[in-house]
Amino acid sequence: MTLEILYQDPYLIAVNKPAGMLVHRSWLDRHETQFVMQTLRDQIGQHVYPIHRLDRPTSGVLLFALSSEVANLLCLQFENKQVQKSYLAIVRGYLVGEGRIDYPLKVQLDKIADKFAQDDKAPQEAVTDYLGLAKVEMPYCVKKYPTTRYSLVRLIPHTGRKHQLRRHMKHLFHPILGDTQYGDLHQNRALTTHTGVQRLMLHAERLIFTHPITQQQITICAGVDQQWLDLINIFDWDLNSIH
């Protein structure tokens, strides 16, 4: 496959990560054969250095450095919360207006990779801003309810905890559609039955940072994939009017 390159200069490269693709090799997913890092390296004929990551089911802007020195400089910006990130998500229920979720999250340990790690750490600070963009009610019967409500929201994380956006939406009782770990399985099944969509509806739409060499502000945006476009069309939302 060929990855969509969103930005490239002598120091950096950014791609639109497809949903379902791992960023790099992991011994926890030994059966996988396609990874963003290896695919991009082969595509441009040059080694790339990861700066941050996106969960496997999440799509959108993914940034790499083209040298270890630039990678270290960019990683510092992420660590110091100098990078602005925004995501689009479709969630269950009506989530309107804007607000801030300030809800600490307990460190999540992997049963295999972290089996010797301490499981008694205090919850870590986790902050997410949200903005309701659009809503719709559809005649999809779920359990005893004859219709289902959905919202398109923009999510802006100010911290980077594991699965932060997915866990914060669950905390608000507005789980992200297609989330098999934190979402509503009945809602996910109904959505797939009526629309054919069966991915996590979470997309990293924008990344803003300071170029570590030129010191210019860089804004990188990623368009949504076909499943997103299909669902937006079914819900009769106008993505072009959303800024």
From Swiss-Prot:
CDD domains: PseudoU_synth_TruC. Its EC number is 5.4.99.26. Gene3D superfamilies: Pseudouridine synthase (3.30.2350.10). GO terms for biological process: enzyme-directed rRNA pseudouridine synthesis; tRNA processing. Keywords: Isomerase, tRNA processing. It comes from the Bacteria. InterPro entries: PsdUridine_synth_cat_dom_sf, PsdUridine_synth_RluA-like_CS, PsdUridine_synth_RsuA/RluA, RluA_PseudoU_synthase. Pfam families: PseudoU_synth_2. It is an enzyme of class 5 (isomerase). The active site is at 55. It catalyses: uridine(65) in tRNA = pseudouridine(65) in tRNA. GO terms for molecular function: RNA binding; tRNA pseudouridine(65) synthase activity. Responsible for synthesis of pseudouridine from uracil-65 in transfer RNAs. Belongs to the pseudouridine synthase RluA family. This is tRNA pseudouridine synthase C. It comes from Pasteurella multocida (strain Pm70). The gene is truC.
